[in-house]
From Swiss-Prot:
Highest classification ranks of the organism: Eukaryota, Fungi, Dikarya, Basidiomycota, Ustilaginomycotina
Assembly and interaction partners: The rep1-1 peptide assembles to form functional amyloid fibrils resulting in amphipathic layers at the surface of the cells. Interacts at the cell wall with secreted protein lep1.
Identification of the protein by name: Repellent protein 1
Listed GO biological process terms: cell wall organization; hyphal growth
A molecular-function term among this protein's GO annotations: structural constituent of cell wall
Propeptide: 22-23
Compositionally biased tracts (Basic and acidic residues): 501-544
């Protein structure tokens, strides 16, 4: 038996050796003298190297194939071969030609014989399209779609690797579009849509754990553009270009999107940090757009002699005043705290996009993002004319913005709207002064007299003396500097409450001896036998019934058009548990500013607080701020909170 088993194994080994010794050549690739390697692993459906050839001593007469190449048409013929389809549209022919200038209509051959494929390919001039589908439910594997409208003499796509190896490795992708290149051109002529040059150094992009990988996606859209070069050119500067993408669901970290409409010769966006560090930290974001920069302008560089639409100003200037700018945003569902939007349409004398790394390595590391658009740069311009739309300057100090646990965080949003403005906006700040508001924040009951209640820093309240508004103000805490003559000014009803305030420091030692009558009955009687007996019976009788109902008498009595605010509380209404938090937004309103003498703009910061010890009377037009209209609105648990919204409007 062992001899028979050994004999069978030797026979099988000899048979396998004969099969392996047979020469066979499965795949041959030639790429102008350079190697192109594509490695695709762990795909849901992997058909990258599928090659099927069946030939059993068949001889084919190719004389019948000559009719398919009788009209050569410079390599623009289309051949369609369809067999055994579930839905057969092989005889359907759709031809769409709009103002083609090549002088040759595209000819379509339907149901060409399959054995003519090699014969047709030898005459295709490099441009014929062959559609070959067999036994597919729906087969779009070789689909090539080209749409051109009014296009002339420009190659649609050219790829050249200038003598270097191009290696693309994609692993464990559900959908791999890392090398996807999409170009759409309408009326494009002789121009470079996109040029990429790494300055003689390596460009490395590492993106990991993405849902969808679009790291190499390049999308260019041009409408009515002139005098530009080839649509797409790729050159790696004489060095290797390596793109490694792993475990991405959607990776758009290197996505570059450029949209230009009638634009010429100019830089759209310049960014400079003033020689200091700019730090942006965003963590646990579902969508991170913290570095998104968008530019909007209308009618830019168009010279109009009408005195509307400002001229000769920068659209957007950002300077950190020589100090660090730190932005910390945590646990945001959507973080748009640093969003800058500028749109520009019909702009001239600008360059679309130039990327150069200054002779250094460019490294992009993005990890654990569901959708990573951190390097997305979108530039849109619409008819803009040299106006300062938005200027931000921190006055030489640190600017720190901390936003936590917001669904949508717009707490630091500042909105300025300029319509037909002739004069530049004045400084826009968040400081508040009591006399800068249309209706004073701190007001008495009578409309004839106003007084400001000042809280002094010294701990001796009896030094505050106010004689004029004594009949109106219940707030002044003291009239005389000494506690002894405090009982003298009894004719006015307002003087006893300050005496209560002066007696409060005396009452504080009083409750102490009462619970502790044993250790200190004598020392309290010795130093103050007389003054303790005189003020004690009156304040002892009064404050005992009054401390619970009378924290209110020292408060300021407010009018019908005013709202009482306690010390340390906000002057503008606060709202909590909001879906949208706009409580810290500033409002700036100016109408007909600069004309007919002008009108002062009001600046009220939403985080302004009352500093008076007796509280403040705030006008309802300020507390419930709604564009100058008095609206009483208290919002809690609201879906959208606009109570603290500060909106800047400037008309004429």
């Amino acid at each position: 038996m062992p001899s028979k088993i050994a004999l069978s194994i030797s026979v099988l080994t000899a048979a396998l050796g004969m099969v392996s010794a047979a020469p066979h050549y499965e795949y041959k690739s030639y790429n102008a003298g350079h190697n192109v390697e594509s490695v695709v692993e762990n795909k849901l459906v992997d058909a990258s190297d599928l090659t099927l050839g069946v030939d059993i001593l068949k001889r084919t007469d190719y004389s019948a194939c000559k009719k398919y190449v009788s009209s050569y048409n410079a390599g623009y013929n289309v051949y369609s071969i369809n067999e055994n389809k579930l839905i057969d549209l092989s005889d359907a022919t759709v031809k769409l030609s709009l103002l083609t200038n090549n002088g040759r209509p595209v000819k379509t051959w339907n149901k060409a014989p399959r054995y003519c494929l090699e014969y047709i390919k030898s005459y295709n001039g490099g441009h014929n399209v062959i559609i070959d589908n067999e036994n597919k439910l729906i087969d779009l594997s070789g689909l090539n779609l080209g749409i051109d409208i009014l296009k002339r003499k420009a190659p649609e796509f050219s790829y050249y690797n200038p003598g270097h190896n191009v290696k693309s490795t994609t692993e464990n992708k559900l959908v791999d579009a890392s090398d996807l290149l999409a170009n759409v051109n309408i009326l494009s002529k002789r121009g470079d849509k996109y040029s990429y040059y790494n300055g003689g150094y390596n460009v490395e992009s590492d993106t990991e754990n993405k849902l969808i990988d679009l790291s190499g996606l390049l999308a260019n859209i041009d409408i009515l553009k002139k005098r530009t070069g080839s649509q797409y050119s790729y050159y790696n500067g004489g060095h290797n270009v390596e793109s490694t993408n792993e475990n991405k669901l959607v990776d758009a970290s290197d996505l570059l999107a450029n949209v230009d409409i009638l634009k010429k010769r100019g830089d759209k966006y310049t960014y400079y940090n003033g020689g200091h560090n700019i730090e942006s930290t965003n963590e646990n974001k579902l969508i991170d757009l913290s570095d998104l920069t968008a530019n909007v302008g209308v009618l830019d560089d168009v010279h109009v002699n009408i005195g509307l639409l400002d001229k000769r100003t920068d659209k957007y200037s950002y300077y950190d005043g020589g100090h660090n700018i730190e932005l910390t945003n945590e646990n945001k569902l959507i973080d748009l705290s640093d969003l800058l939007a500028n749109v520009d349409v019909l702009k001239k004398r600008t360059d679309k996009f130039s990327y150069y790394n200054g002779g250094h390595n460019v490294e992009s590391d993005t990890q654990n993002k569901l959708i990573d658009v951190s390097h997305l740069t979108a530039i849109v311009n619409a008819l803009s004319k040299r106006t300062d739309k938005y200027s931000y300057y921190n006055g030489g100090h640190n600017v720190e913005s901390t936003n936590e646990n917001k669904l949508i965080d717009l707490s630091d949003l500042t909105a300025l709207v300029n319509v037909l403005s002739k004069r530049s906006l004045k400084g826009y700040g968040s400081k508040i002064h009591a006399r800068d508001i249309s209706e004073e924040l701190y007001r008495r009951t009578n409309a004839d007299e106003d007084c400001t209640c000042v809280k002094k820093s010294k701990p001796t309240p009896p030094k505050q003396t106010v004689t004029k508004p004594s009949a109106d103000c219940d707030a002044p805490p003291a009239v005389t500097p000494k506690p002894k003559p405090s009982t003298k000014p009894s004719p006015s009803p307002t003087t006893p409450p300050p005496s209560k305030d002066t007696s409060k420091p005396t009452t504080k030692p009083e409750p102490k001896p009462q619970p502790s009558d044993k250790p200190e009955p004598k020392p309290s009687d010795k130093p103050e036998p007389k003054p303790s007996d005189k003020p004690e019976p009156k304040p002892s009788d009064k404050p005992e019934p009054t401390p619970s109902p009378k924290p209110t008498p020292p408060k300021v009595t407010c009018g019908t058009d005013e709202v009482y605010v306690d010390e340390g509380h906000n002057v503008v209404s606060k709202n909590s548990n909001k879906l949208l938090d706009l409580s810290n937004i500033s409002i700036n309103i100016g109408i007909l500013d600069g004309l007919f003498g002008g009108k002062k703009s009001k600046e009220v910061a939403a985080d302004s607080t009352c500093t008076s010890k007796q509280g403040c009377c705030v006008s309802k037009s300020v507390y419930y701020y709604n564009g100058g209209n008095n609206v009483q609105s208290s919002n809690e648990n609201s879906g959208i909170d606009l109570s603290g919204l500060n909106l800047g409007l400037d008309i004429l």
